[in-house]
Curated annotation (Swiss-Prot):
A cellular-component GO term for this protein: ribonucleoprotein complex
Highest taxon in the source lineage: Bacteria
Family as reported in the entry's similarity comment: Belongs to the bacterial ribosomal protein bL21 family.
Protein species of origin: Listeria welshimeri serovar 6b (strain ATCC 35897 / DSM 20650 / CCUG 15529 / CIP 8149 / NCTC 11857 / SLCC 5334 / V8)
Gene: rplU
UniProt keyword list: Ribonucleoprotein, Ribosomal protein, RNA-binding, rRNA-binding
HAMAP family associated with the record: Ribosomal_bL21 (MF_01363)
Official protein name in the record: Large ribosomal subunit protein bL21
GO biological process: translation
Its biological purpose: This protein binds to 23S rRNA in the presence of protein L20.
């Protein structure tokens, strides 16, 4: 059985036992997170939500809070002596999917 959930403005296909990386969620390591925005549940009998499947939830456990590798943003304007260098590290949350309840 699998499901498609919405979190952080993105849609992610998940299965039980899978590890996923999502946009930063509030919670400490070991906390349980429940996703109510389930768009689709697949398996023996598929359920399509309009826009969400009624009564369907996905539970996951927070494994890690972290930050991605650094991205360097460099801007400049030619012939004007304007240079700007800036770094960015996107925060993320690593989850392990425990169960899909449909």
């Amino acid at each position: 059985m699998y499901a498609i959930i919405e979190t952080g403005g993105k849609q992610i296909k998940v299965e039980a036992g899978q590890e996923i990386y999502v946009e930063k969620l509030a919670g400490e390591v070991g906390d349980v997170v429940t996703f109510d925005k389930v768009l689709f549940v697949g398996g023996d009998s598929a359920k399509v939500g309009v826009p969400f499947v009624d009564g369907a939830t996905v539970t996951a456990k927070v494994e890690k809070q972290g930050r991605a590798k650094k991205l360097t943003v460099y801007k400049y304007k030619p012939k004007k002596n304007y240079h700007k260098k800036q770094g960015h590290r996107q925060p993320y949350t690593k989850l392990t999917i425990d169960a899909i309840n449909a």
